[in-house]
């Protein structure tokens, strides 16, 4: 191991001091050039971007590695070059050619070239871990990735897809964490057999991003140091992520000045720190939707009038105000806020009379009995109980069947439920990530290879599947957005999904802290613009 510089030693020392301070102790605020955040680090099992498939680890990758492009959060139809300076698409729509910025370097000091970019994408596919599935979305497989992802010269790389896709979709895939650029020379020096350096990278880092890894202590902390060779200026010299599982402990650390930000406060804790003036809170909608899935194998739930009636039998505003509060907001369409083509329409509210009229039209004027599989955890249990009471107003008797996440999900995936309450989270910020889940079912048979959400609810939708495929291939971003908006309008009126809420990330920061960018997915959380007064 190389000797640590004095700055890195200082960072580690500061982190250890912070960890040792009792929660009740009053102390000076964190150093002006250090940002300390209380968060949850229990998802970390590896540091390899080709293996990571969890939320907070994706955030780590987003700040230690670069990729070809990144989506513009202000306009999801646009992309900003990361290591790519410019790019073109061939006339047949299959090949994307990227020109790289000259003079880029990895944290190791090795130059970043097109060979590294091509090898990084090939590596992720050939490793065949969870993230490879994202790259498979544009047709890259173990059989073709070496031929389809090529270095043309030191500053030019090309990626060829298996069919014509919307350019926004391809760029979203190539701008996601599985396509992170890794240091080929460094990883090959640590390769064991044919593991592409995976064993070494599980606990080390080989990136070129704004911050480099100093130390990861599993279940405790991650310490990052500013990469002074980065192409953009960074105000924070050090970033320290602390694992603090209890929300109350996060609040005390924040109030005492031991951390600059807390990511996992409860609604009551958030209200408390704002009232005391010791913190400010920012809210960022997340690409996670909480919904009811209605299994159309149940003949009653298969009736369109029943599906619509249930949408009028949820007290969305009441549940939001009394159960989930500021951690979720009402959202009823399948594309989350911030996605290309999002339709922010919430036409449904609790209307028992309208629901009863629809049930009568469906031939069940007195209601019916049904089961709901519920994960025995907050907020699922509390929301399910509220929905149970709502449905009872129209004579619908709901039997709640509690279970852990593994049990309820297994039953859902086997299509053995009546109603399932759960969440869907997008892997990347492209509308296809959700359209494929809610509006695509090419084979409704039990032996289907495509078991997405529509399949799980036995919803046979050949026409909507064609529309999803057409939207995926639409080359013009504006027309693509229109296609998704039309699909959302159709599904609001006719679908076995009662989409209720969108998750909201609430971040509490100390006064004087600014610039923490929290996108709709963890892969789009950035420390680049962090500042402290």
Indicate where each model-derived feature is located.
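Short, well-ordered beta-strand elements
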Residues: 31-41, 85, 95-97, 117-121, ...
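Alpha-helical secondary-structure segments
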Residues: 36, 113-122, 154-160, 164, ...
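N-terminal lobe/hinge region of extracytoplasmic solute-binding protein
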Residues: 38-91, 122, 204-210
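Gly/Pro-rich hinge or "lid" segments in bacterial periplasmic/extracellular proteins
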Residues: 73, 175-233, 352-353, 357
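Aromatic- and charge-enriched surface segment that lines or borders ligand/interaction sites
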Residues: 85-131, 152, 158-160, 250-253, ...
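Surface-exposed binding/hinge segments that line
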Residues: 99, 118, 136-189
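Ligand-site clamp/hinge motif
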Residues: 199, 226-272, 397-399
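Detector for C-terminal structural segments
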Residues: 217, 313-342, 378-388, 409-533
């Amino acid at each position: 191991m190389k000797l640590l510089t004095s700055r890195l030693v200082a960072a580690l020392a500061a982190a250890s001091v912070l960890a040792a301070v009792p929660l009740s102790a009053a102390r000076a605020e964190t150093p002006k050039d250090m940002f300390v955040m209380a968060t949850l680090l229990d998802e970390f099992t590896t540091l390899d971007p080709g293996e990571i498939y969890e939320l907070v680890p994706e955030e780590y990758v987003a700040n230690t590695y670069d990729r070809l492009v990144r989506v513009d959060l202000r306009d999801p139809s646009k992309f900003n070059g990361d290591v790519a300076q410019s790019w073109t698409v061939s006339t047949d729509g299959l090949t994307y050619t990227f020109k790289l910025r000259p003079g880029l370097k990895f944290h190791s000091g090795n130059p970043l070239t097109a060979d590294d970019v091509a090898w990084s994408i090939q590596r992720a596919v050939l490793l065949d871990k969870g993230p490879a599935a994202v790259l498979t979305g544009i047709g890259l497989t173990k059989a073709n990735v070496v031929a389809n992802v090529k270095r043309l010269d030191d500053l030019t790389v090309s990626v060829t897809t298996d069919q014509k896709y919307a350019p926004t979709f391809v760029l979203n895939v190539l701008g996601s964490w599985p396509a992170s650029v890794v240091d080929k020379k460094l990883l090959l020096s640590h390769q064991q057999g044919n593991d592409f350096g995976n064993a070494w990278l599980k606990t080390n880092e080989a990136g070129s991003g704004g911050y480099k890894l100093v130390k990861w202590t599993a279940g405790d902390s991650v310490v990052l140091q500013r990469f002074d060779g980065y192409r953009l200026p960074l105000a924070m010299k050090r970033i320290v992520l602390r694992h603090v599982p209890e929300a109350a402990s996060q609040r005390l650390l924040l109030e005492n000045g031991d951390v600059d930000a807390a990511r996992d406060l409860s609604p009551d804790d958030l209200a408390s720190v704002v009232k005391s003036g010791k913190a400010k809170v920012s809210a960022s909608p997340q690409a996670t939707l909480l919904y009811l899935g209605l299994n159309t194998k149940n003949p009653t739930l298969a009736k369109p009038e029943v599906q619509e009636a249930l949408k009028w039998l949820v007290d969305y505003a009441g549940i939001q105000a009394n159960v989930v509060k500021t951690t979720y907001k009402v959202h009823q369409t399948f594309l989350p806020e911030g996605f290309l083509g999002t339709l922010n329409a919430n036409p449904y509210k609790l209307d028992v009379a309208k629901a009863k009229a629809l049930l009568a039209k469906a031939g069940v004027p007195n209601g019916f009995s049904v089961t709901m599989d519920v994960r025995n955890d907050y907020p699922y249990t509390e929301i399910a109980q509220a929905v149970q009471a709502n449905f009872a107003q129209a004579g619908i008797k709901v039997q709640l069947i509690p279970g852990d996440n593994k049990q309820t999900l297994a039953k859902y995936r086997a299509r053995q439920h009546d109603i399932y309450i759960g969440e869907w989270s997008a892997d990347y910020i492209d509308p296809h990530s959700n359209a494929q889940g809610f509006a695509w079912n090419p084979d409704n048979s039990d032996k289907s290879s495509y078991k997405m959400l529509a399949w799980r609810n036995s919803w046979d939708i050949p026409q909507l599947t064609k529309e999803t495929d057409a939207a995926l291939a639409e080359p013009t971003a504006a027309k693509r957005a229109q296609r998704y908006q039309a699909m959302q309008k159709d599904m609001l009126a006719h679908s076995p999904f009662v989409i209720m809420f969108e998750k909201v990330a609430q971040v509490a920061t100390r006064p004087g802290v600014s610039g923490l960018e929290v996108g709709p997915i963890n892969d789009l959380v950035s420390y680049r613009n962090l500042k402290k007064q």
